Amino acid sequence: MLRMSAWLGLSLCAALAAIAQAAQTEHLIFLSTQLRPIEEAQRMRNLVLKDFSGEVDYITDLPQRFPTRIETERQTSMHSIDLVGALHGELQPLVALDALVPLDDLAGRLSGRGISNPLLTLGKLGTAHQLYIPWMQAGYIMVANKQALPYLPSGADINALSYDQLATWASTLQEKTGKRLLGFPAGPHGLMHRFFEGFLYPSYTGGVVVPFRSEAAEAMWIQFASLWRNVNPNSTGYNFMGQPLLSGDVWIGFDHIARVLDALRQKPDEFIAFPAPAGPKGRGYMPLLVGLAVVKGAPDIAKAMALIDYLTQPKTQVTLVRTVGFFPVVNAKLPPDLDPGLRMGADAIAKMQSAKDALPALAPVGLGQRGAEFDRVFLETFQLIVLRGQEPRPVLDQEAETLKRLMSETSAPCWQPDPPNTGACQVQ
């Protein structure tokens, strides 16, 4: 532990020194927790930023050091960072530090670019002001082998499916082919917990923590257990859905886009990508949204805003897709020569976030190092109810106690789509 603390301290000092050196050049300093690998960072510097009118020093840092760095500059009044780029959940703690410049006027000037209202609302970080401008995004999608399309329920729109229709589709496939062809990444290193936290729970209950043990949640688990009877039993070993889709073991799958992109790239003519289904409360989905924010005390706020303007221009957003694989947040016409797998993924995410019933559900916020414990609550609930066949009510009541204790001990407030609150988020 002492070694780790010392390492973080030395790393932070080195990083601050790098920023100080960059500041002496009077370049704009852009600090990002994303695109950190050397190749991606070089693409940012050499391809994405090359047409900006000013000189930019693009510097990356680990997410766990990000708030400490901002707080250190605030406490010492030695400001060098002009612009920050980070995930929504990484920017959220800066609200309590009162560290971000309101960007309401800039958001108004960018209103014609087509950034969706749900994404702009996320950029307010629960306040009345626009504290970050959405920059780029990734996410989770559904992918289907085109062989499955003739078995869609009558009248179903694949871009506006409901969970009931998905269940009927999977049941029909099993009936007609004799195989369970729906798959989920429920393996030990899969992202099944994100499906529950960002898709299923919001779609059926309208929240995640608050309605965890509600009657709506109980009904949801009963329905999902029924659906699971038509899910490929090997799903409990799937960590990435790309390979089972390519092999044909699965005809319909859910996963993070990065984990199915290989299938879309290898056989683009055989697959279709589409939004996640909707439930009674809406089309829950978990946006992986990266925002751009200006730190209070920034040496050149005007230039920082100019860089935000540049990075959200459609042309720059297309360059981001091509070079680093993140998708646009603005209305950007994708070029005809774009990798077809990337195009399918971008289209599916765009359709999901622009759906009339879209219900964004954030990744857990405020849990610190205990995020895995939160995930475990949902995975254990799934294992007990769906895989072991236990009754939902006693399982939900038992797991709710674990969830209550975790929220209380971390003092984590509610995050969207649960309603705003003061203090720890409470399970009803």
Q: Model-predicted segments: where are they?
A:
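Hinge/lid segment of periplasmic solute-binding proteins
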Residues: L87-I141, A167, I272-F274
